[in-house]
Amino acid sequence: MSERLILGENAIYTMNGEINDNILVIGGSGSGKTMSLAEPYLLETYASSIVVTAVKRRIIEQYAPLLRSRGYDVLDLDLAHPDRSDVTYDPLAYVESTADIAHLASAIIDSDPRKAYSSADPYWDKAATDLLKALIKAVLIRRSIGISAGATFADVLWLFDELSFDDKGGGRISTSLDGFFEQLAWSDTDGCAKRWFSSFSNLPIRTAGCVYSQLATLLSEAFTQELRNMMQNSSRALDLTQLANQKTALFITISPIVSAHRVFANLLYSQLFKALFELNGSRPLPVPVKILCDDMAAGGGIHGLPRILSVIREKGISVMALLQSEGQLNECYGHSAQSIFDNCDSLVYLGGMDVRTAQHISQRLNTGLEDVLWMPVGREYIFRRGQRPVKTVRYNIQSNSLYQQLLRNYKVSQEVYGCDTLRDN
């Protein structure tokens, strides 16, 4: 069955048409983004793999049975309770080359939610990235020569935990890992580990302290002990390429209040996009992949997302991103936010209290600002490239017979199995 795109009442479109299938959904809290757009997106998933970030367990519990009935392998990555996940994720599992190392380190630094508000010298980011690259490279070298055969990203974090430094005079530093990297040089054939580490160890003491403090805060918050434990469990390791080769639904559950989960999820997304792009040459993926990302700009940026959105169509990848306001995206991605808007051929506005967003919507509509700000709850504007804007009522999913059946089944399961039907059933 072909997949449809339900954007509103009597606003149903076909996927894979003349325009791209990237969709931005903007609406304030409680505007109906999940029920009127995200859940219909799931209902209409028949042939594509899908990755869903959600803050409510209800989403996976309600839709997993439906997707399994359609032949999907449903994977549950619960970052709020990693020990309960049926798959695990280790960022180091997708690192082989120097380019992979650079990508992972940059993705971690870019995922810092404080970057939007920071006035720190951009050089600090480069120095922190080089330090992280050095630690990743060191762990990979040790793994390749058999010292740490089962090394994971948790080993990279452990190595950082071991790092300390003192003033050796003249404003320069000596570190607790100087000897470690000297010994490693025998196996560091391209010299990258030593060179990257030297960019940190040669810093003045005050600058080194700032770089170290910035990176320590990010790593301690983004990689909780529970997530470190999960990364060390390789028996249920997630294979990101599976999404491109068979119908798969990956649900990523995050806490609505723990920013570390969003940072970790954004890191996964950055590696997912890279892994999918490297498959099948320049040809489309065997199985199209849809990404449904709730509150996409709420926890730091996804590394390279503006550029990624401009080219993912050729691979058969599409994104539905849910936001509360345009300002949220601007804070996260800065000037690159405009590129994200430009590469989403569908925009749905459900209303909200953000005046700047309303101003931009009124400009798109060529109408007065008050018409947008005073739009009744339950109404929405739909913008599609090459078409006139549509003002309509948001989709009432509760009138959908399939949704009604899913809801009945979910309620029965709740009564029989308790609070988490997937784990108790």
Predicted regions located by residue number:
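P-loop NTPase motor domains
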Residues: 3-10, 14-317, 332, 359, ...
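A short, sequence-level motif marking secondary-structure junctions
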Residues: 81, 394-401
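C-terminal catalytic subdomain
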Residues: 319-322
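Conserved H-loop
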Residues: 324-328
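Short, glycine/polar-rich helix-capping loops at beta-to-alpha or helix-loop-helix junctions
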Residues: 329-339
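Conserved AAA+ ATPase "SRH/arginine-finger" region at the nucleotide-binding site
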Residues: 347-354
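Conserved AAA+ ATPase core "coupling" helix
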Residues: 356-362
